[in-house]
């Protein structure tokens, strides 16, 4: 059985982080990361774009999330999972296990 589930995505935070605490007392921070890049596919350049919902869970990660604002440039590493929205539709969500701020060089 194949069990690999890893994703690394860099981009810009495009929606204000929302902080919540679950009924079991676990803090969560949710935001959306927008990625834009040029990738090579079959020998051709291709413009890529996506918006990925990010969830950061656990007490040890929450101090870092308070520095995340709209416009923050990040690299996020973690695993993906499916979440069902209130409308009943499923969406992929990246559960962050490591977050690094990208220095803009300013």
From Swiss-Prot:
PROSITE patterns: SSB. One of its GO terms (biological process) is DNA replication, synthesis of primer. It holds the Pfam family SSB_1. Gene3D superfamilies: Nucleic acid-binding proteins. Residues 4-103 form the SSB domain. InterPro entries: NA-bd_OB-fold, Primosome_PriB/ssb, Prisomal_replication_PriB. One of its GO terms (cellular component) is nucleoid. GO terms for molecular function: enzyme activator activity; single-stranded DNA binding. SUPFAM superfamilies: Nucleic acid-binding proteins. Keywords: DNA replication, DNA-binding, Primosome. Belongs to the PriB family. Homodimer. Interacts with PriA and DnaT. Component of the replication restart primosome. Primosome assembly occurs via a 'hand-off' mechanism. PriA binds to replication forks, subsequently PriB then DnaT bind; DnaT then displaces ssDNA to generate the helicase loading substrate. Involved in the restart of stalled replication forks, which reloads the replicative helicase on sites other than the origin of replication; the PriA-PriB pathway is the major replication restart pathway. During primosome assembly it facilitates complex formation between PriA and DnaT on DNA; stabilizes PriA on DNA. Stimulates the DNA unwinding activity of PriA helicase. This is Replication restart protein PriB. It comes from Yersinia pestis.
């Amino acid at each position: 059985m194949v069990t690999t589930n890893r994703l690394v995505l860099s981009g810009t935070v495009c929606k204000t982080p929302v902080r919540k605490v679950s009924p079991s007392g676990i803090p969560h921070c949710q935001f959306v990361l927008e990625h834009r890049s040029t990738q090579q596919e079959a020998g051709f350049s291709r413009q890529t774009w996506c918006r990925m919902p990010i969830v950061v869970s656990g007490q040890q990660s929450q101090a870092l999330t308070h520095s995340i604002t709209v416009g923050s440039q990040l690299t996020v590493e973690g695993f993906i999972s499916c979440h069902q929205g209130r409308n009943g539709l499923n969406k992929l969500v990246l559960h962050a296990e490591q977050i690094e701020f990208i220095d803009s060089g300013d």
